[in-house]
């Protein structure tokens, strides 16, 4: 059995051009990265759980059960709970998440998802500042500047640069990579930084200070000289980065957990979103987060 245009269930890139051919206990995958291929291989894996399992009275062992019994047992546990927590994974559909939220409301439960331990601060930053965003297709067709801030997509989201942001030919970026400039903001010299046109190697946990300095420069003022010592980034590098951002036709910033997990948390994200809003007085600029799980963004939308 062959299927085409399957959405990959791994990372937030949500590549929708995957081809899968299932034959008995073997599966062949095309167009997916290594992470995507490994995920699809789980379908035929020997350790895949294929039926409900019930643990009786705290026993170590579990026993197989029919779906009807498992659903009834689950309902009994939820009905008896005083304050249940419904933690919805980020690898299921928006429709299933919506049902889960209705269930949580009916039970008076707490509903949560992977955002709490992932890009939760980024979502809070959006609530504080708002977000100027665009679809991946718009960035592919229009963007001539990509800024990767606190993320290393060549390892964590392998097809982002090749399918959406840097290498593909777009309507106004006919030459692909040759029509684009790439900036990496990362304390480490990652593989993404090595393949960028400009690497801003700031000190760990100084994202907020660097973002604030860029905002100050954007407003036509000079930041305090101490910002160079604090961030480890020279004022000339900040000015070079800002000129590239102001001079592009359509810029895209992609933030990762480097912003959400460092000192400042949601205030880092808020500053990044405010910077993008201010950049739109000079050119067209958008910002988005590179999410880890395939539908972790879906829960935030629901």
Feature map (PLM): residue ranges:
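Residue-level signal for secondary-structure boundary elements
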Residues: 112, 119, 222-227, 283-287
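Active-site-proximal structural scaffolding
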Residues: 96, 139-140, 175, 246, ...
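A charged, amphipathic alpha-helical module
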Residues: 222-262, 266, 274
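Internal, well-ordered alpha-helical segments in soluble enzyme and binding-protein domains
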Residues: 139, 206-210, 237, 241, ...
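N-terminal export/assembly segments and adjacent metallocofactor-ligating motifs
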Residues: 1-221, 232, 257
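Intrinsically disordered or highly flexible coil/loop and linker segments, enriched in small
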Residues: 83, 152, 250-254, 281-285
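A glycine-rich, hydrophobic/aromatic-adjacent loop/helix-cap motif
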Residues: 260-302
